Amino acid sequence: MLKNVHPLLSGPLLSLLDRMGHGDLLGLVDRNFPAHRYGAPVIDFRGVDTGQAADALLSVFPLDGFVDEAVHRMEIDGSPDEITVATERLQKAADAAEGRPVRIASVERFAFYEMAKPVFAFVHTGETVPYSCYLLRKGVV
């Protein structure tokens, strides 16, 4: 048992996050995303939505402050400017964790799949809101 560690953060997940370096990507993806296709480790957060996962992850995971866009979201096909409730929850968690407004960039769905190829690891949530897939670039502490 550890003090001051979010209860969703398991030992294997903390180990993965610790091994990530500055600039590495973490995928925070919904239940429909084909995370296992990429060959990166996949941490199962079934039953956890995007907001809950973001609150846990961002309690220990610094976002990159040296780039304009440390978070990318998958666009909704045919409605690229639409912001889902899941994205709103991620935005709230990111802003709170970083103590500043965090810009979430929009990426077309197929471009997002390509952008996810070098991901270090995925956190596969049980999020039911479609297109709730995000890439988070790790910063420094």
Predicted features and spans:
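Glycine-rich, aromatic-bearing surface loops/beta-hairpins
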Residues: G78-V141
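A phosphate-binding glycine/aspartate-rich beta-alpha loop in the early core of alpha/beta enzymes
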Residues: G39-V71
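Structural motif
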Residues: D24-G27, P41-V42, D64-R73, P101-R103, ...
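Long, hydrophobic N-terminal alpha-helical segment
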Residues: M1-R46
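Conserved phosphate- and dinucleotide-binding cores of soluble alpha/beta proteins
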Residues: N4, D64-F66, L136-V141
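Catalytic cores of large soluble enzymes that bind and process phosphate-bearing ligands
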Residues: M1, V5, F45-D49, G78-E82, ...
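Amphipathic alpha-helical interface surfaces
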Residues: L13, D49-A53, A86, L90
